[in-house]
Amino acid sequence: MKVSELMEALNLKLLTEEVALDGEVKGGYASDLLSNVMGQAEPDMVWVTMQGHQNIAAVASLIGLSAVIVAGDAPVAEDTLKKAELNDVVIFATEASAFEVVGKLYELGIGK
């Protein structure tokens, strides 16, 4: 599934501008502990979190994640979005809880 298709299927709000939405989503990972994400997530996964600080952009770029979904209507700092855009990291937001997002990803066939 393409990132753009995921955005449409989950009705996600795109927070980053001028980023590529044609990447593949090959799996998913959910955690708010950055070291856990760095040790367990794999390239081309989508990451579900409630973190909004700029380190999420750094971790996503380092791993090569397809996108980050910030759940629960959690705030995302402006410096996070700037850093993400510089590194072509897609960041979405949703009012849905992390639990709901993960369930929807599973229903779409996105899993490890």
Annotate each language-model stretch with its function.
Residues 3-45:
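N-terminal first-folded block
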Residues 23, 34-46, 50-112:
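Feature captures the catalytic cores and cofactor-binding loops of soluble hydro-lyases/lyases
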